[in-house]
Amino acid sequence: MFTLRTPCSLLPALALLLCPLAVQAKQPTPTIDVTARLVNIPGKFPADELYDYAYVMQYQVEGGAMDKQTILVAHYKPRRARAEIDDNMKKVVGGSLRRFEVGALHRLTLTASMREVWKGAVVDEFFDTDRKSKRYFCLKADLADGK
């Protein structure tokens, strides 16, 4: 029969079992890079002073992993230029885009794991007519022609 001489003799075995659980690092959110044309801004953006929000817009992908697909993309505080975001989302959202205009071609870095990066309000005027499509969150937005 197995007997323990001291309670401390279990510590090395316990440490070996629990250590992998303690050091699991959170994996970075996977990203998707696409070139897409902004085809629909369904309404007016709320005022930034009211609350922090992400606003869903519709794009037609013209390059990258999802070529020729129509996608819905949430942008954090779209009234602001991407470089002017200065709150706690500055470390998440970037790019050189100054404003969102229908017809503009954008280079976007997206994540399909929106709730991992944004847990706040989402203004989604597509929700009533399209509940099935995935909503992507934009991490970086630039004009595709670099202007």
Model-assigned labels for residue ranges:
Residues 1-6:
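N-terminal secretory signal peptides that target proteins for export/translocation
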Residues 9-20:
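Bacterial N-terminal signal peptides
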Residues 7-10, 45, 84:
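Intrinsically disordered and other compositionally biased segments
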Residues 15, 26-28, 49:
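Generic marker of residues within folded, mature protein domains
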Residues 30-49, 55-58:
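Structural detector for short beta-strands of small beta-barrel domains
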Residues 53-57, 62-146:
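Disulfide-stabilized netrin-like
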Residues 21-25:
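Sec/Tat signal peptide C-region and signal peptidase I cleavage site
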